[in-house]
């Protein structure tokens, strides 16, 4: 067969999309077409920040039906989403309550309990995962302690992409790359860790053994009656994005830029040393047994909140105004946990500047400048941490995802990090999702083979660092500004 048609369902914390890929195996060309795009946002339910899971499922099914109604024979479907959040099911496989978002404050104070009762080094030795207050381990502890009546009804817990696959196929699956984000998977066995799971109060019977990407979960029956395989892709969206990152060699780092920024490198081994623990480095699962050694950065969430609060719709115009402003007048630590979900992001940024005796950004452009400069300097700081961890410098940084369209931030990143930046592809998570499907269909050999396809089909933009830029002169001064309460213990 010359042509393959695969559908990627890619859900982010702010939007979702159903994308159709067409792969020509003879010429190794790959094209994407957006079929359906929809909004994903938090809602308040009984005092909790929850996801409208039924609306998301409705939009997923609508997108799939649109493809089928075009008369296209779909070869496979794959679903990726953000990590850590989950859906609870009862014995009949029916949903129990609504899934609570990782941004909800129910986990406040939970992580410190684990550090005392289990021990920080012991948790890290077992999981190899960074300490974030909203990791699934702490969410489950909050659930079992705060909602025992709800907990009593639970028979299964599925992570978000596995839930949607279950709704399409009727088959339950626990995909490995996303499972590792829970901080509950043992890094040595690739299975759920009994000690960590027991601490949460959740039952091990709620979970099946994690499966690696590339297996067929089951079939979705389309309106025309065709049975279409649903593939377990690398269902954590960052894992999919990394698969589509055209990393040139071992000296290349990646930055998946969106609501969150995930900066790291690929490795055949995990890093769980005391140095890695001190830097709060995570070792999330990847495809083909690789590890995604990385750090979470708050990312463009800060900007997204400012845009929403200020009702700004013309982002290019705002960026143009921002670029005209002097650099580094206002600097914050984007990873300060005060920015996780404040009532007023603009006011929170202003307060952070005021508390550190800096000028206070007032205009929208000044707020954006503060965010961009601070992110670029944090990227440089974390890239330095990662290089020290592996004992080797990086020569190139690949920025993928929606954030790679921000040319100003890309250049600031190159200047601050002092290395060449390659930006693209934009739809990295979708492409990585498609890549695993094509491998499962025996159209591609492995991840490296797929990256050659990506490089041949998608243009990348190069940014050369300017060592004389204003931001480059602030790199050494930024470290003290990070001495705030970050997203870690």
Curated annotation (Swiss-Prot):
Disulfide bonds join 68-222, 353-370, 413-417. Its EC number is 2.7.1.5. The keyword ATP-binding applies. SUPFAM superfamilies: Actin-like ATPase domain. Keywords: ATP-binding, Disulfide bond, Kinase, Magnesium, Nucleotide-binding, Rhamnose metabolism, Transferase. InterPro entries: ATPase_NBD (IPR043129), FGGY_C (IPR018485), FGGY_N (IPR018484), Rhamnulokinase (IPR013449). Pathway: Carbohydrate degradation; L-rhamnose degradation; glycerone phosphate from L-rhamnose: step 2/3. Substrate binds at residues 83, 236-238, 296. Its cofactor is Mg(2+). It catalyses: L-rhamnulose + ATP = L-rhamnulose 1-phosphate + ADP + H(+). GO terms for cellular component: cytosol. The active site is at residue 237. GO terms for molecular function: ATP binding; glycerol kinase activity; rhamnulokinase activity. It is an enzyme of class 2 (transferase). GO terms for biological process: glycerol metabolic process; rhamnose catabolic process. ATP binds at residues 13-17, 259, 304, 402. PANTHER family: L-RHAMNULOKINASE (PTHR10196:SF93), SUGAR KINASE (PTHR10196). Belongs to the rhamnulokinase family. Involved in the catabolism of L-rhamnose (6-deoxy-L-mannose). Catalyzes the transfer of the gamma-phosphate group from ATP to the 1-hydroxyl group of L-rhamnulose to yield L-rhamnulose 1-phosphate. NCBIfam families: PRK10640.1, rhamnulo_kin. This is Rhamnulokinase. It comes from Salmonella paratyphi B (strain ATCC BAA-1250 / SPB7).
């Amino acid at each position: 067969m010359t042509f393959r048609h695969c559908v990627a369902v890619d859900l982010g914390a702010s939007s979702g999309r159903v994308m159709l890929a067409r792969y020509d195996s003879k010429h190794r060309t790959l094209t994407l077409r957006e079929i359906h795009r929809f909004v994903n946002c938090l809602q308040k339910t009984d005092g909790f920040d929850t996801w409208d899971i039924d609306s998301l499922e409705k939009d997923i099914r609508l997108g799939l039906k649109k493809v089928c109604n075009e008369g296209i024979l779909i070869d496979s479907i794959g679903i990726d989403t953000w990590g850590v959040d989950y859906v609870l099911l009862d014995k009949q496989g029916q949903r129990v309550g609504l899934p609570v978002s990782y941004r909800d404050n129910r986990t406040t104070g939970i992580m410190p309990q684990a550090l005392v009762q289990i021990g920080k080094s012991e948790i890290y030795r077992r999981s190899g995962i960074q300490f974030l207050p909203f990791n699934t381990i702490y969410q489950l502890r909050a659930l079992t302690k705060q909602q025992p009546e709800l907990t009593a009804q639970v028979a299964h817990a599925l992570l978000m992409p596995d839930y949607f696959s279950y709704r399409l196929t009727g088959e339950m699956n626990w995909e490995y790359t996303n499972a590792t984000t829970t901080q509950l998977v043992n890094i040595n066995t690739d299975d759920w860790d009994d000690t960590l799971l027991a601490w949460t109060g959740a039952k091990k019977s709620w979970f099946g053994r994690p499966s690696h990407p590339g297996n067929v979960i089951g079939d979705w029956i389309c309106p025309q009656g065709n049975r279409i395989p649903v593939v377990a892709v690398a269902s954590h969206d960052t894992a999919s994005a990394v698969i589509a990152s055209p990393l040139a060699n071992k000296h290349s780092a990646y930055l998946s830029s969106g609501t969150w920024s995930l900066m790291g490198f690929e490795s055949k081994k995990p890093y769980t040393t005391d140095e890695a623990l001190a830097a709060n480095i995570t070792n999330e699962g990847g495809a083909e047994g690789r590890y995604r050694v990385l750090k979470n950065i708050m990312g463009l969430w800060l900007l997204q909140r400012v845009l929403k609060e200020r009702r700004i719709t013309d982002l290019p115009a705002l960026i143009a105004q921002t670029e005209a402003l002097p650099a580094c007048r206002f600097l914050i630590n984007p990873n300060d946990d005060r920015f996780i979900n404040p009532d007023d992001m603009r006011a929170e940024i202003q307060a952070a500047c005021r508390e550190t005796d800096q000028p206070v950004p007032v205009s929208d452009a000044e707020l954006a400048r503060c965010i961009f400069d601070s992110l670029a300097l944090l990227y440089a700081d974390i890239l330095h941490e990662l290089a020290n961890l592996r004992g080797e410098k990086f020569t190139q940084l690949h920025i993928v995802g929606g954030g790679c369209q921000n040319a100003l931030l890309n250049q600031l990143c190159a200047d601050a990090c002092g290395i060449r930046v390659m930006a693209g592809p934009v739809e990295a998570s979708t492409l990585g999702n498609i890549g695993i499907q094509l491998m499962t269909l025996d159209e591609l050999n492995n991840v490296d083979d797929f990256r050659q396809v990506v490089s041949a089909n998608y243009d990348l933009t190069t940014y050369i660092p300017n060592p004389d830029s204003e931001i480059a002169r602030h790199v050494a001064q930024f470290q003290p500004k990070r001495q705030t309460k970050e997203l870690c213990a």
